[in-house]
């Protein structure tokens, strides 16, 4: 595992923000998939501020989501809504560069629509960069232990939270694994035990999707703060 440890979550987020600047200056549009959760909120707030808000060529970045809950964008549970509030409302970015999962739609209709958009915009299915989180149960995106089909050939899937039953749409494991780069952004001491388990146990012996999903032809790295990394 490629673990990179930062003193704090803010340091990890600053590194990602610096890399957004680099991606925005490529000679082709860069397709980046975002994650929900508390640490990404820190990232979005950082990107919306100086110097990044000015340094990044937002026209060259296309944003997608690893997953989203089937709620309206105004709902506090919406991953897209969070980014809109913390980042998009504060920068100049073309509307066509934002490829959200439309949580207000009927799930099966939206699954079909979202997969069609993915196919049309990223015809080879290869993302430049996918940023993922990891739950304390080892889930990533909305791919949960004991209910993820790692061989699903579709681009996206309807998922149900194992406890709340909440419906989401998620990228499939196979689509994520085609990315040029995957960065797991994991912070806080609440993740220390599971990171230790992932480090010390072969992935095939674990139920955790975050332990099993990696870039098949690219780079996979884990950005951790020192609290998350304390048992490694």
Curated annotation (Swiss-Prot):
Keywords: Hydrolase
Enzyme Commission number: 3.1.1.31
A Pfam family it matches: Glucosamine_iso
GO biological process, one term: pentose-phosphate shunt
Enzymatic reactions: 6-phospho-D-glucono-1,5-lactone + H2O = 6-phospho-D-gluconate + H(+)
UniProt similarity note: Belongs to the glucosamine/galactosamine-6-phosphate isomerase family. 6-phosphogluconolactonase subfamily.
Function noted in UniProt: Hydrolysis of 6-phosphogluconolactone to 6-phosphogluconate.
Entry protein name: 6-phosphogluconolactonase
Organism: Aggregatibacter actinomycetemcomitans
Gene name in the database record: pgl
């Amino acid at each position: 595992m490629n673990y990179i440890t930062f003193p704090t979550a803010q340091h990890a987020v600053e590194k990602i923000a610096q890399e957004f600047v680099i991606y925005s200056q490529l000679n082709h549009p860069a397709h980046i998939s975002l994650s929900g959760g508390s640490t990404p909120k820190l990232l979005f707030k950082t990107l919306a501020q100086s110097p990044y808000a000015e340094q990044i060529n937002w026209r060259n970045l296309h944003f997608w989501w690893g997953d989203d809950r089937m709620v309206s964008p105004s709902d506090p549970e919406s991953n897209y809504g969070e980014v809109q509030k913390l980042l998009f409302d504060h920068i100049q970015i073309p509307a066509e560069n934002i490829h959200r999962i439309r949580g207000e739609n009927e799930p099966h209709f939206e699954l079909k629509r979202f997969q069609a958009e993915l196919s049309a915009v990223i015809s080879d299915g290869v993302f430049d960069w996918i940023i993922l989180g990891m739950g304390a149960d080892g889930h990533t995106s909305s791919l949960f232990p004991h209910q993820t089909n790692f061989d699903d050939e579709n681009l996206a899937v309807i998922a149900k939270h194992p406890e709340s039953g909440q419906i989401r749409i998620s990228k499939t494991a196979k689509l994520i694994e085609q990315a040029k780069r995957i960065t797991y952004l994991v912070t806080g001491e609440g993740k220390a035990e599971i990171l230790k388990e992932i480090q010390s146990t072969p992935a095939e012996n674990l139920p955790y999707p975050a332990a099993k999903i990696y870039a098949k032809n690219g780079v996979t790295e884990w950005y951790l703060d020192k609290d998350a990394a304390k048992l490694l």
